[in-house]
Amino acid sequence: MWWVRRTRYWFSTLLYAGGARLRPGRRTASGGLETPGSCGAELQGELDRFGGVSVHLSRHHTLHGLDAAAFRRLLQAAIQQWRSDGRIAAWLHIPILQSHFIAPAASLGFCFHHAKPHSSTLTLWLGEGPSRLPGYATHQVGVAGAVFDVSTRKVLVVQDRNKLKNMWKFPGGLSEPGEDIADTAVREVFEETGVKSEFRSLLSIRQQHRSPGAFGMSDMYLVCRLQPRSFTINFCQQECLKCEWIDLENLARTKHTTPITSRVARLLLYGLREGFDKIDLSMEELPAVYTGLFYKLYHRELPESYKAATGAD
């Protein structure tokens, strides 16, 4: 989809701009030649391949001690230069200890794009028409692990301590930045129950908009099928009220569970009876279009003959 492609482009831009540093004598976004100590004269930035410019205030040491009014004049001059140079957007990265620069930037049209623990990023669209810059992350990702033991036909479930209703559910939690889905499921299961497990497949994906647990944003909740590597329960009493191995058929029938847990339990029951190939989304690592990067692709099992087949076969 168009917004996915555009977001990929701009996020690659952010990653590039965040990792690169201008060296003495390199051409800058202002069009001048950067030399040590020149930052006080003009606000230097880094160009990206889409025609935008990124400015990291943490790299401008001469800004320390500068008042808001002086910074506004400096930024205003830079904006005029960027417009003259045909730049289409500006990204302003402000450390938390320089937050007094946010107000003058906002007075010149900058808006918040996103924030991290120690910095915020503001944007200004300089191109024609409405802004075409993508928003920041639209979803949070939660992952649960359905640890199912085929030999005993039991599945591991918990009851959350801080819920209004004591409903059985699969252990899980939020994925950490840069953490794979499978790793999140295994980690969360161990942290909540003390049971070690191994990833087998992805079973389901739930998307919920305006989620209260995601600060009103959208929430993605993925349930993975895991195979147990240990069976002794030592659950986290801060998070869980109960933790048990429950017969799968009983879990599929009970009313004391969440709708998604009930549905996944029935999915597991179907897989047990008819074959897990009917329900599993397997994972394979493939090379990304970005050099040196890889991604995980989840889909129904594809025969090896089709993996190697060409369009003419």
From Swiss-Prot:
Nudix hydrolase domain segment(s): 138-270
CC annotations in GO: mitochondrion; nucleus
This protein's record includes keyword Chloroplast: no
Primary localisation category: cytoplasm
PROSITE patterns according to UniProt: NUDIX (PS51462), NUDIX_BOX (PS00893)
Pfam families given in the database record: NUDIX (PF00293), Nudix_hydro (PF18290)
Protein family according to the UniProt entry: Belongs to the Nudix hydrolase family.
Organism lineage: Eukaryota, Metazoa, Chordata, Craniata, Vertebrata
Coiled coil: none
Additional record remark: This protein is coded from a FGF2 (BFGF) gene antisense transcript.
Stated name of the protein: Nucleoside diphosphate-linked moiety X motif 6
Keyword Zinc-finger on entry: no
Designated gene of the protein: Nudt6
Function according to Swiss-Prot or TrEMBL: May contribute to the regulation of cell proliferation.
UniProt keywords, alphabetically: Cytoplasm, Hydrolase, Mitochondrion, Nucleus
Species name: Mus musculus
